[in-house]
Amino acid sequence: NLDHSKSWNCQLFRSITDDSADLDPSKSRSLNSKKGRLLDASIAQAFIQMIRGSHNFIYMESQFFMGSAYSWLKNDDVSCDHTIPAEIAQKIVEKIHSGERYVAYVVIAMFPEGDPSGYLVQEQLYWQTRTMEMMYSRIAEAIRETGNGTHPTGKCNFNVKKIAYFINTKE
């Protein structure tokens, strides 16, 4: 007899676009089209399901951790819509209000793929900052409301992973 209350559930998700796979829209309900490109939306659905079903913590790695622009403190009129950051923040807020332990561990790239000083990477880092700011603000508000003596970084922990970046290397 296994005690499932003490078991772990680990899922691995990998996103794909029509650049990396031959996608047939007639065979999948999770394909969306954005700017003329097909992408598989099932990863977002899977993340949301895992976030909502998690009990004590969630661990995720993402090269591009940004989204939920509709909840940002500063409205930048950006189409950075996916809901995963807001889902994580909401889960943490719910756990704070119920007095339960919960931590989100998010590992992000020090620099997204591309030239670190380039406009696109700098814009992505800015959006990532707005995303983290929104999450920490919501968590801090829940901590204040409940009188919980913790700090938001004790509930949502961002860790930076250094990824090697090479520009036009020649042997």
Regions found by a protein language model. Give the residues of each.
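Charged, low-complexity intrinsically disordered terminal segments
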Residues: 1-171
